[in-house]
């Protein structure tokens, strides 16, 4: 097994990356960046091209932000399309993201991001903009993602042959936190844990969850960009590990009506300029500082406007229904898993908020940018969150302003008209991203569902 990718005391530089490849026998490296949906798109690059790209960058067709997750071209975006003839966009390699791929003989792997004008529509760059804003306000972000995902005894071919019906789960039934299940499948668990450690994506906890074949993984906390990088790497290479074992993993928000949806919760905290918690106040009943109250209040206030950046697929809205461990309104509580935001009293080192509305299928960079941007907005405007929700939020009635959009289309319209969104993320980003979500809903509307056939075919 490969040794873990070491996190150097000083950032891993372009010179370090060049030296690493020069002193190796590798003829190629692998590079990748995410599209709007959070899918890693990349290629093998020769060492000579890599050396040049480290210094000058390289070109990638800007279709990477001009198509959907099925490579269908958007027809409603201004940034790129047939009207621009899909030119190349400049890309920079990020040497500090270097990993070694253990299943490719430790091949060097680097994340990248769009640069120059293309930064305006680059998911990773949008997060970086929010982190720069936080730094300008005297804060740094610590974040940790946790994911639920279903595992199947299927292959990409078999699920298509079955038309995604009657799939065989890795394990049957409800059996959360099962020692039996993780012992029987210990080889798979250890391969996942070991691979992620080698990819500098340490898993703090891995266990079965509620549902057949469903697992939950908690990724170790890190700085903002590094946390989102790890989340992206975790999702991609979990699917790689599964398929290399003739299995499949899905991070779809809700793949079946019979089971709860899959979350991608984010734990977040801010540190001040001295590296101390900006969220903790031991004198407060909930140990919340004024900064934390304002941060949570901003998230509560803006979540309805930013939901398209949080629930990014049509399917994600099937998860946001009562009784399935997912929030249904923009609310907060202390140690309350029925609200959108869960404040966790963790003392001076781990006082934090859990952003529970996040779905597993969301782009980590976009969702973290939305969550952070909303919180910073609350701090800037000294918003107050009101009283925390106590008890079961599903059984309570809340003000209309806390209601969440019910469809992706409605969420995209809220985002387009959001002044805070345009102020935080820029007009170019809001217009481009909202258009991609409108496209996604339009594609969905072209298809007839099984529910419609069963309900209307004979009776209506």
Residues of each region from the PLM?
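Glycine-rich, acidic/polar active-site loops that bind/position phosphate-bearing ligands
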Residues: 2-460
